[in-house]
Amino acid sequence: AVVSKEVDYGVLMCGTGIGISIAANKVPGVIAAVCSEPYSAKLTKQHNNANIIAFGARVVGSELAKMILDEFFGAEFEGGRHQRRVDMIREIENR
């Protein structure tokens, strides 16, 4: 749904968030990041233009999960110097 633009962002969970993020990043067009705290959630959107956030149900409690999601959904991609990195990721996907 994220790749087809039916939705803007996705949220994935597994035990640690690691396995599901690895699997999600195999899908062309997805930039998924595991975040266990709010600061990383904000920066992965601002600097990496992540469109999926993943976290671990065994790692993150419900209140912390809400804080993480608030930061992720409230952040905007900054572009600029970060656009080069995103372009490199997209180039690798297209190989």
Which residue ranges define each predicted feature?
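General secondary-structure propensity
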Residues: 10, 30, 70-72
